[in-house]
């Protein structure tokens, strides 16, 4: 069994697979003042930073958090931590299409918006069925309808 954890302010994400390593990241969407601009310019690829900076503040921050969770999921999947660098992979997000550029074997990405957070999953396999359950810190279990916002075909 393979599993990985991620957490944000009041939510924990756990990804479990009986077949392969996974990468997961969850981040609560929150205001970063203008620091999201500096972070993206210093740690993302030049094209990603340009895409983020060119947007109005709110949309730029949303794109920043989408990119951040995808990058973190990928880095966790590869098992190398931040030593890989956040610019080791480049993402292009348009409508419901996600494409990526990186070196190595195919990786499949999925991303969801859950309440006020983005959740990203990286896997070497296309996973036909993904179950998401929310376990809030308050110890009550409740279920939400989740909206898939991006998915890739595993090709560079």
Q: In which residue ranges do the predicted regions lie?
A:
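Core catalytic alpha/beta fold that binds nucleotide/phospho-ligands
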Residues: 1-156
């Amino acid at each position: 069994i393979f599993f990985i954890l991620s957490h944000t302010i009041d939510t924990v994400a756990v990804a479990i697979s009986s077949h392969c390593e996974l990468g997961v990241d969850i981040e609560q969407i929150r205001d970063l003042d203008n620091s999201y601009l500096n972070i993206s310019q210093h740690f993302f690829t030049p094209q990603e930073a340009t895409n983020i900076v060119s947007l109005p503040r709110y949309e730029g921050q949303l794109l920043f958090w989408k990119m951040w969770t995808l990058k973190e999921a990928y880095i966790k999947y590869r098992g190398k931590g931040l030593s890989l660098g956040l610019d080791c992979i480049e993402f292009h997000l348009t409508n419901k299409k996600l494409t990526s550029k990186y070196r190595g074997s195919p990786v499949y990405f999925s991303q969801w918006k859950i309440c006020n957070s983005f959740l990203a999953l990286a896997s070497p396999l296309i996973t036909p069925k993904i179950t998401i359950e929310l376990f809030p810190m308050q110890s009550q279990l409740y279920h939400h309808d989740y909206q898939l916002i991006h998915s890739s075909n595993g090709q560079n």
